[in-house]
Structure formats: C-alpha cells, structure tokens
C-alpha cells in the first residue's frame, strides 16, 4: 500500500503528498489543503460582490458603520435641526420622529451593550406617518436615515401579497435593505425600512372578511411578525421562496419600520367619533376650510380610528408612534422651492452654473409656481414637474450657446408657458461683446 501512497498527487494543482500539509481523498480524486483554501477565497469574493451569488450569510469583516453608541447618537433636538435643513414645516411630526428614533437607537445600544442590571426590556416602537401625498413623509424618513448613517430602503405596500399568491412576498422588503447595506447582514439589521401606501392594504370593512383579501388584510397579517421582530428567511435573488433555495436569515428585532400613507377618508371616521361626544355643541372645526378642518382632525387620530378605517388591531398595536403631517400651503410651497439645502431652485442654479450661466427666479415667478403646484393637489411633487416643464427648452438650448450670461425666469413664463418666451428670454440678457 505504501508503494502507491508515495505517488498520490492533488488532482487540481498536481503537488505530491510530500509537498502539502494535507491531501484529502475522494472517489478517484484528491485535493490538497492549499487548493481548499484557494476555493474558500474565491467563494468569499463572490459573496462580497453585489451581483454575485449569495449563501445563507455573507461573511463581512470590520466594525459596523452605524452610530449605535450613546455618545455618537445625535440628540432629538439635533435630529430635528438636521430635518429642518431639508424639510420645510411639519414641526410636530419632526418632534415625534426625532424622539421616537432617538429612543429606538438608545434601545439598540442597550441591547448591544448587554450591561443592563435591572433586566428591563425596552420594546421597539415602530412609527406611522399620516398625511396627504407630497407632504414629505418619504423625505422625512430618508433624511432620518442620513443623519443616523444607517441603511434605508423604501417599499410599496401595494405590490405585496399574501404568501402563495401572485405578487411580492413581504420578505422582499428585507432584501432591498440588505442590498442597500452591501449584503452586510449586521448593518442591515440596524437599518430603517419605510413602507409607503400602507393605507392601501386596509381591509374593506371593520368586520373580518369571509373571502380572501390577498393584498389587504392578508398582507397586514404577513407583516405582523416582521414589525414585531422575527428571524426572517430572505430569498437572495428575490421572488418567491422554494424548498431548495438557500435563504439569508435576518433578525428584524432592531430594524425600525416607518409606515406611511395618505389615509384618505380617515378624517371622516375621526369626525364621527368626536361628533358623538360633542352632540348639542358646536361641531369641531366649524367655520374652517375643508383642508384645514381635515388636517386638524388628523391630529386627533386614535388607534380605534385606524381599526375602523380597515387596519387590523394587531397591526395598529405594532405601530404605537403616530404622527400626522399637515397639507402644504402656498406659503410652504414657496419656502420648499427656495429654502432647503437641496431646494429645487438651488439644484437648477447649480446645473446651469456648470454651463457658465447664472439662473435667477423672480419672487413673482416662485409664487406663481407654488400657486400652480397647490392647484394640482399633489404637494411638493408637483413643484419638480412644473419647474421641469419651465426649464426644458432653456436647458435644451443653453448648453449650445456661449453668448448667454444670465437666464431669468419670470411670472409671465410660468403663467403662459409659451415656447417663444422660453427661447427668447435668454437672448435678451446681456452678452459678452464679441472680440
């Protein structure tokens, strides 16, 4: 036997048994310890690549980037100050968010430190944002993630369906967060997930449905464990899970979920409840405009109102922190155009400045844009659409022209939208004298 053993070689690199530390035998093949180590390195590199195949848990070295210690964690007032730089108005919602997020990551630092002597367990408090479209719900959640330097993912509740039906599984929400975290499971488990259009998965009535509601109550049921905290199996390539697929395990106990929705009609539920308590007296909000009355009513929302709206009680119980955002006024829209750090006017001024052209919006033009956006009833989202329409011809022509120093956007351009004005206005500016 020893006669043949001396001639054993690695089937991959060709090294003999004497040249390596260990030679592993298989049915008709041999592999040395050096080739095994090389294979492990190749697999690890594939796991780290965002487009590479994944197994159960990607191996990631290093310390987490998230601010989890109390010393690094910004205080509620600091969080609100940061939000003020990017989001105009909504002061009450900002305070609620700042306190809730600060307490959430305080809880996370306590869990990681594991030095609590009195064994008091702090429960997670997910957040519900209610407000009309374009009022800043997504932007608030996104800005929170920026100040805390944590992974942030956005999901649309309307695309989710109950397991076993056509559509996305709720676990695909976690996959988006994992991808944003560069496949770092530990980092993803400290992130923030914003679930938009959460009001669209309300069941059709307060009473439990006899028929299946696969994109309503069924999705709420599927989200319960994820919101509360569970170890979820996430399919690495997305889509439906199947028995022979390797899944990544993610613990959602420390992921902060922020749910947002317009909740159109919820104010009527609140008004009905309040009206019953104030029978014989002046109705709340009487004499106010419809929008103002609806906004005031939303500030008085209670969990029972959400249940009557169509959210199941178990779901409402897992989002204890609620904040209502006010609809945007014309004055607020004017401020949104000009004041935030990344205001639309500043963005377009920077774009034209790269072509050596100065861009200026007259105050009357800004007001006219805000008035048109207010009429569209889509909040701040309407602003970008209007400015894009205004600037299209200007930004098409100016890069090819070298004689324009300044571009002025006037009230007439906003109101008339004539192509001739947009093209002729830059040419009326002072141009450098030809040599």
Curated annotation (Swiss-Prot):
The keyword Glycosyltransferase does not apply. Zn(2+) binds at residues 10, 13, 32, 35. GO terms for molecular function: ATP binding; ATP hydrolysis activity; ATP-dependent protein folding chaperone; protein dimerization activity; unfolded protein binding; zinc ion binding. PROSITE patterns: CLPX_ZB (PS51902). One of its GO terms (biological process) is cell division. InterPro entries: AAA+_ATPase, ATP-dep_Clp_protease_ClpX, ATPase_AAA_core, Clp_ATPase_C, Clp_protease_ATP-bd_su_ClpX, ClpX_bact, P-loop_NTPase, Znf_CppX_C4. Keywords: ATP-binding, Chaperone, Metal-binding, Nucleotide-binding, Zinc. ATP binds at residues 132-139. GO terms for cellular component: HslUV protease complex. Residues 1-51 form the ClpX-type ZB domain. Component of the ClpX-ClpP complex. Forms a hexameric ring that, in the presence of ATP, binds to fourteen ClpP subunits assembled into a disk-like structure with a central cavity, resembling the structure of eukaryotic proteasomes. Belongs to the ClpX chaperone family. ATP-dependent specificity component of the Clp protease. It directs the protease to specific substrates. Can perform chaperone functions in the absence of ClpP. PANTHER family: ATP-DEPENDENT CLP PROTEASE ATP-BINDING SUBUNIT CLPX-LIKE, MITOCHONDRIAL (PTHR48102:SF7), ATP-DEPENDENT CLP PROTEASE ATP-BINDING SUBUNIT CLPX-LIKE, MITOCHONDRIAL-RELATED (PTHR48102). HAMAP family: ClpX (MF_00175). This is ATP-dependent Clp protease ATP-binding subunit ClpX.
